[in-house]
Amino acid sequence: MSFTAWAQSHARSILFFLATLVVAGVVASFSLPVALFPHVSFPRVRITLDAGDRPAERMAVEVTTPVEEAVRAIPGVRSVRSTTSRGTAEISVNFDWGEDMVAAMLQCQSQVNKILPALPVGTSFEVERMDPTVFPVIAYSLTSDSHSLIELHDLAFYTLRPALSTVSGVARVTVQGGRVEEYRVNVDPDKLQSFKLTLAEVAAALSASNVQVAVGRLEQYNKLYLVVSDTRFQKFEEIERTVLRSTPDGVVLLEDVAQVEHSSEPQWIRVTADGHDAVLFQVYQQPTGNTVEIASGIKAKLREMKKQIPDGVKIADWYDQSDLITASEHSTRDAVLIGIVLAAIVLLAFLGDWKVTLIATLTVPAVLAATILLLYVLKMSFNIMTLGGMAAAVGLIIDDAIVMVEHIVRRARGSAEGDARSRVLRAASEFTNPLAGSSAATIIIFTPLAFLSGVTGAFFKALSLTMAASLIISFFVAWLAVPILCASLLRTDSKIERPNSFAQRVHEVYRENMQRLLRRPRGVFLFLIPLLLLGFLAFKNVPSGFMPVMDEGGFILDYISPPGTSLAETDRLLRQVESILQETPEVQTYSRRTGLQLGGGVTEANTGDFFIRLKPFPRRNIEEVMDGVREEIEQHVPGLQIELLQLMEDLIGDLTSVPQPIEIKLYSDDEATLHTLAPKVADTISKVKGVIEVKTGIIPAGDALNIQVDRVKVALEGMDPDAVTKALDDFLTGNVTTKIQQGPKLVGVRVWIPRDARETMRNIDNLLLRAPDGHLFPLRRVATLTALSGQPEIMRDDLKRMVAVTARISGRDLGSTVRDVKRALVHSGVIPNSVLYRFGGLYEQQQIAFRGLTLILFAAIVLVFLLLLFLYESFRVAGAMLLIPIFAVAGVYLGLWLTRTEFNITSRMGMTMIVGIVTEIAIFYYSEFRDLPPSDDRFILAGINRMRAIFMTAFAAILALLPLALGIGHGSAMQQPLAIAIIAGLVFSLPLVLIALPALLALFKIDTATGAAQRE
């Protein structure tokens, strides 16, 4: 008994099992995590170092280089890249893909800890592995006209942050902006001098007066008491009454030399939202968190806490990743439903039977539900790649059902032998091998895709795994469930089906033309050679990119004001930028950070970013909005360097440390050469069409005031250089000498000189220092003050000095723009032979991805050839059939060119898949060819018999992919090039399979006596 017959005898149990899988898949869909991206551990560890404010050159020698050399010795490290600025350094340690990044991060921490004692005293570091969870999933702003920034900060930090951290899936909640409460002790220098006191003595007195410490235990009356000495300040006035000195003449109180005021910590940052000073709080998810559920939980928690939020405080969300995810889910749902309906129309038009249509269309939701169950078992998530994979698989899923149903209908209705059930059983049994072979042709394409690495593999493994799972499940449904349903629902009388008049006319035209072609089969090259030439022409002219660009509904604007610009002046420039944003009709809301970054890192006071959220559609395309904002800023805010990019592009760039599309790395040991050459290179490439936002890579820090202490003179005064440095720190930064507890927070008490007494170089020069013997002397007696221009950041790549000239692209594709940039550099001769240079950035990632996908394409072709050889044991048959998908690849290039679609990693995925899809259709034709009785008309008859099935599968797949190809809905842009590539290949597959394949088989002299290929 055949397996098909066995399946028919167990129809109820099989259908019940499939129904159970479907129900389980539906249930699993409610538990599957939802995220924007697949969970990917990028092979990059970021080490941030802080060593005070030492110059960049010294920082590079004393801190950066030792750490670089230490982490370079870790096994698996591929490259090390560093950026060193004044007092800080950031080192990117890149590992091979597939490394255990948790272990890699721990190794980096261990290596830095080993050498930490050898680094300058006070050096601190932070090690962070990069993954998509380093960016927030939802963020809010707090603004108010009636509450201070201190109150807003306390509300966010002490009320909202703890409550929101309890939401399931939340990793942490961070707070940016606002002011931190502090008591400021403003010391009058003249009064301090009159009492012969120093700032250090004031600070020591405050610290000693605010103490709570356990001094022992007392056992009395069968009880044990803890004895606590408590001299803490209880009231604001008690600070002023602190005793600084006690003499026989009386006591000196703090109020005698200083004024105490309620103030806030000094800050060199500024945070705004929609033009108002604001406090931002950002929610980060755990790696396995459900973004949509987290966002929903945060919103619900904020509603619960509404009564705890004071009147006059406005809470507004300025970023919500769940909106994009939800929109992508809805567009995927719509794309699937539209695709099913369009495919159903094709079935109904060709077969004219609503039951057939029902059977075929029911397979799609059943297969997708079972696929979701498999994703749940594999601990994957709903994201733009898995959702896109399911949407793209709809056409291929329904194809399996179509070919099985069409074969059953054609065979069962054209035979009078046996009852209806036996005819269906026989038809399904004879189609098992063709269905298995054709399904295998598509499924094995995804085998080499499992070996993808880099950014391509990180994102597209999820898509390929989803599609492969869908197709495997689809095969079993078409093989087992479809025949069972056909036997139960279809009317399979013995009346032979007659094609309608239109079909008869098509068959006649096909027969006439094929008879002429088969008499001279070499004539097929009159079609194939022009197709190859057109494909080559398209290959040379099709635009190329890296990843598809989709409208995410918001973008990031990074900015840098001129080096050394004060925070106040930077803020003034940015208020002009805010005015431009407020006048842009598409802008819904925005937030701004100065001295901070969206990811939470602290930067210089002249740098920062905006996040701009756009209104829902209808509106202008996001690229047009970004171009408009860029033009306005460049015209009205000169001197401000800006960079506009969407969040996904920024995220991928930060995760891979290559954020710019164009990056020209210049290597030389001569720093002066690099600093002279970089502006020339930037000027050269800025003249290339489409190149914008060109940056030299030379980022100088602000000016510095260097205080050179003379050790000999200090020693003569009875002091040491460290004491002078401490006195300067107290004078300029102040000294938080103690803290006062107020409810859940500790409020610092800072001893400081008033601003008007320390705002000039003369004030610093005249700073009075007290020697151990009590005499006072001015700083100028032992030190020299020198103003220094800011040193540029130092970049190194694998321990080599490097400057990276970067640029972005507007209105052009990546491939042609970089070609023009290379041509401009060669023709200008601007880079001397003594300087090594190479291209990095997203272009380098594109080339790495393309090389990998090219190998994948060749591997797919080899696997398809092996499958064909296994199925038919004939090199000639396998070779003839393999030529069909290869020629279809030329059609893919042509389709991309005609639709002006970028040739990127998504369209290359579609091109690889088309090899299997077209082979699948070719197998349908050849399986019919083999089964026909020997005759001279067999090539033509096979085409006529399979024509309906081939047209149905092609049209159904094309229409099912049409919503994706048209870019309907959010998130569809990611799969749009893939859909267009597959559709183009399917369009060309029709003439290739029905016309070119018979001619090639005839040309290869397939044995006509037995209807089988001659075995070599």
In which residue ranges do the predicted regions lie?
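Interfacial helix-loop-helix hairpins and adjacent transmembrane helices
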Residues: 1-15, 414-426, 455, 461, ...
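Signature of alpha-helical transmembrane segments and their immediate interfacial
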Residues: 1-34, 429-431, 498-547, 627, ...
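Solvent-exposed, membrane-proximal periplasmic/extracellular interface segments of envelope transport
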Residues: 3, 8, 58-130, 190-211, ...
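Extracytoplasmic/periplasmic membrane-proximal domains and adjacent transmembrane bundles
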Residues: 6, 15, 48, 90, ...
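Transmembrane helices with small-residue packing motifs
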Residues: 12, 20-58, 113-121, 380, ...
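Hydrophobic transmembrane alpha-helices and their membrane-interface caps
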Residues: 25-31, 36, 341-410, 469, ...
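Transmembrane alpha-helices and their membrane-interface boundaries in multi-pass membrane transporters
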Residues: 123, 394-408, 432-451, 458-498, ...
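Helix-loop junctions and hydrophobic alpha-helical segments within the transmembrane domains
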Residues: 318, 325, 329, 405, ...
